[in-house]
């Protein structure tokens, strides 16, 4: 299985002046935890890190004689463009790909393995977790419009996995139609292509705010304590 790690995050919501993936988490940069989990996965055989040139040296510095091929791929100005760049940077023999947010640094090796097994069996999927809160749809005036059925709501996460050829076709259609999507599953939805959810649990958070960093520190401490 080939893996693309989206690593072009900013530090704006962190109040930081650099890529949030380079902020310290339990003594190491956030991105180091993400890469380590991918390297420990039994099914991941090739890793592409998609990011901006300004972060290249710092991100690659976290690698210490990696056990698998790890390649740097120059990203675009948006996540959608960066995924396109990542797809272009895949080896010719790549048939399936997982795409993972570098900021989801609590993903464990077994999650990558579970996702890879489903994708290699021919099913597009996303890691996700059922929504536990009651969700309200609210208008621009701040007034509640309605309450979606919580039993049908899942919070999308990563990894997200697809057949490479089909994902490339989807992105080509998005470019032709001028579509903007926030993840690849949304692209599949527009095209009417099925995507399965795989329950990854609530710990697979995306580190975006200082509070998220605190939560991630606590989770890592619990895992370390065994």
Swiss-Prot record:
Gene name linked to the record: ispD
Enzyme Commission code(s) on record: 2.7.7.60
Pathway(s) the chain acts in: Isoprenoid biosynthesis; isopentenyl diphosphate biosynthesis via DXP pathway; isopentenyl diphosphate from 1-deoxy-D-xylulose 5-phosphate: step 2/6
One annotated GO biological process: isopentenyl diphosphate biosynthetic process, methylerythritol 4-phosphate pathway
CDD domains per record: CDP-ME_synthetase
Descriptive protein name: 2-C-methyl-D-erythritol 4-phosphate cytidylyltransferase
Catalytic activity: 2-C-methyl-D-erythritol 4-phosphate + CTP + H(+) = 4-CDP-2-C-methyl-D-erythritol + diphosphate
Function per UniProt: Catalyzes the formation of 4-diphosphocytidyl-2-C-methyl-D-erythritol from CTP and 2-C-methyl-D-erythritol 4-phosphate (MEP).
